[in-house]
Amino acid sequence: SFLKIGDRAAGAIKSGGTTRRAAKMVCLDLDHPEIELFIDWKVEEEKKVGALISAGYASDYEGEAYRTVSGQNSNNSVRIPNEFFEKLEKGEDWELTARSDGRIMKKVPSKALWDKIAYAAWRCADPGTQYDTTINEWHTSPKGGRIRASNPCSEYMFLDNTACNLASVNLRKFFNESDNTIDVEGFEHTVRLWTVVLEISVLMAQFPSKEVAQLSYD
């Protein structure tokens, strides 16, 4: 599938001698007809890893066992609307629908699907969960369109074809242990300064497409 092709492409970028490995987020709506396969993808692949390690292959993440299987070059997440949790509370089935015309392709017990997500997350740390309804309720630019995905680590949610640069602030530097106070003014100044710095860095970046460049600028 194209999902596995994208995974291999990211792996090639990672091993291409660059200073930073590829970063890729893959999101799938919970009502997608192939959602069960998506949830189980890494679970099944890591079973193969276990078999290869038992056969004597290296167990480190850069070793042959992990390089051999798919699904190791992205963060996978499922987009869950509030409607699913309503079905879950009532013990009702969840409908999987065709992307082209919305036809119901299959009904699955909502609890079984939720248990599958929980088991997969425990077994191999994926998929992550993104709460689609809440994310779009908190959308700061709703007229621009729906938020359908995030950056690879899921801390930045925004429109399709937009870019983000990230920074971190050491909060301990603003905390005075002698009197248990926080330098609020210093923190506010730092946040304002870094917001400007990141805006400039985004605008100075080289974008992969005209659409990404324009929406990042706007």
State what each model feature region is.
Residues 1-189, 203-217:
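Active-site cavity-forming subdomains of large catalytic enzyme subunits
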Residues 189-198:
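Long, compositionally biased non-active-site segments enriched in small/hydrophobic residues and glycine
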